[in-house]
Amino acid sequence: SETPFFYKDMKDFANRIVYYESSRGCPFRCGYCLSSIDKRVRLRDLALVKEELQFFLDQKVPQVKFIDRTFNCNHQHAMEIWSYIQEHDNGITNFHFEISADLLNGEELALLAKMRPGLVQLEIGVQSTNLQTLEAVRRHTNLDKLRHAVVRIHSEYNIHVHLDLIAGLPYEDMGSFIRSFNDVYSMRPQQLQLGFLKVLKGSYLEEMA
């Protein structure tokens, strides 16, 4: 809440993507990510978040891209924000969130199903479907729940879905990467984003290298 609001004068940001953070930190321990070093999650005050989102809505910003590491790691926080943008939709602004799909529960999926087409887009990090790889990088994903959530979201035809993969993770050879790619492609995302592993200084993977 003490972090100042950067976007008071929108002249310099006209027709641009606005980056916004409603939380810092991540409760998970993915070995390639520096956010895993500090597992605390600090949430911005919701009243302040709503005030700032309303400013973006009033300004008719084309897209607000949330840079929270795992937006839906706190159910109440996510529901409050998703409910607010659904109730105050201006018919123009799109909101982008990075989420863990296997954390989505029935209440969240039902709310997402009510969104105007184009109001929300979701970026979902799968990274790999190789269980040995996921264990090696300390990424605990329920792949069955993830797939079920993506299928449920697709069934409403209202949300643009990005699915992410990382090439170069431990125990991922060409054969297993092809399987991961095919697994993710079969979920029929609107966009499949491929990143390449960067061993970041201070990360768990650097320690293990």
Range-by-range predicted roles:
Residues S1-P4, Q191-Q193:
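Short, basic, helix/turn surface patches
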Residues E2-S155:
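Radical SAM [4Fe-4S] cluster-binding motif and immediate context
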Residues F28, H75-Q76, Q132-V137, A167-G175, ...:
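Flexible glycine/acidic-rich beta-alpha junction loops that bind and position SAM and/or redox cofactors
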Residues R69, D164, G195:
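Conserved acidic functional residues
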Residues W82-S83, S180, A209:
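Short, hinge-like loop/turn segments at secondary-structure boundaries
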Residues E108-L112, P170-S186:
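Catalytic cores of alpha/beta
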Residues K114-V120, V184-L192:
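Structural recognition of alpha->loop->beta junctions
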Residues I159-L163:
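C-terminal EAL-domain catalytic cores of bacterial cyclic di-GMP phosphodiesterases
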